[in-house]
């Protein structure tokens, strides 16, 4: 475990098949292939039992059934992948929340790993409040209006100065987290979601900065916000317009659906292994 604390009791909360290889060749179904070596790559995520017990107690108090516990970036990836067990999606998925930034690398439809660091939207709000002499609520409103063409030039200058340093620190966190994946070739697409991604300076920094040059990208990555309309196998049947800030919730819904339908009749190798991991 990353904590190096052998006394921490943990439980497996998320698992998924990343890839199957026979003698170095990636295959979807190994049946019928001949070879000497079969390599199965798995994604697993664990949580301390003390945290899980706390969640279970909250559910008991609220008289709710605990369907599943999920790592946020894994849930977001599940939303992006949908029901297609043979998806070829390759991307870096970033969920920029209020307190953390969660990053996942997806390669050919498999979640290769997840990382997290503790800088999110609230960090930017606190910096804006401090630099501009505002309370937290006013700073949050100003942050949400950052892209408004009606912002006065002097206020714009102060706002940009307030978030500049935080952007640099956040970018360094992204670099370190992605470097920690130790991937030889990173996907050329970065997909953003979460409330923190609403700050345009974040996507602009990723899309135009030189931060990627020290990492194994073949070229400058393409950066985009995840559109709920592009999330497969999920339909918004309400009158409410959704945006990238709802993707995390859609991901948790996806994991819940996966859990409830975990005894489905999909007979593919990936599906069988996925069900085996859950048991």
Provide a role label for each language-model segment.
Residues 105-107, 115-116, 178, 194-195, ...:
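Active-site proximal loops enriched in glycine and acidic residues that flank catalytic Cys/His/Asp
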């Amino acid at each position: 475990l990353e904590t190096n604390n052998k006394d921490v009791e943990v439980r497996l909360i998320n698992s998924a098949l990343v890839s199957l290889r026979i003698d170095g060749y990636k295959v979807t179904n190994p049946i019928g292939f001949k070879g000497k070596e079969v390599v199965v790559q798995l994604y697993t995520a664990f949580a301390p039992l003390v945290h899980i017990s706390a969640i279970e107690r909250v559910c008991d108090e609220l008289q709710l059934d605990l369907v599943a516990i999920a790592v946020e970036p894994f849930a977001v990836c599940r939303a992006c992948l949908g029901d297609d067990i043979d998806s070829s999606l390759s991307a870096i998925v970033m969920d920029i929340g209020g307190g953390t930034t969660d990053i996942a690398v997806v390669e050919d439809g498999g979640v290769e790993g997840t990382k997290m660091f503790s800088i999110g939207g609230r960090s930017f709000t606190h910096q804006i409040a401090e630099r501009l002499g505002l309370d937290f609520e006013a700073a949050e409103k100003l942050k949400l209006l950052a892209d408004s063409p009606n912002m006065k030039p002097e206020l714009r200058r102060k706002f940009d100065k307030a978030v500049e340093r935080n952007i640099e620190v956040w970018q360094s966190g992204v670099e370190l987290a992605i470097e920690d994946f130790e991937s030889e070739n990173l996907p050329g697409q970065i997909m953003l979601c979460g409330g923190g991604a609403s700050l345009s300076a974040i996507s602009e920094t990723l899309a135009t900065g030189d931060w990627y040059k020290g990492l194994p990208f073949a070229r400058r990555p393409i950066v985009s916000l995840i559109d709920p309309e592009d999330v497969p196998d999920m339909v918004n049947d309400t009158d409410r317009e959704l945006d990238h800030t709802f993707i995390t919730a859609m991901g948790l819904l996806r994991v819940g659906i996966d859990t409830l339908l975990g005894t489905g009749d999909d007979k593919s190798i990936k599906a069988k292994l996925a069900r085996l991991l859950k048991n």
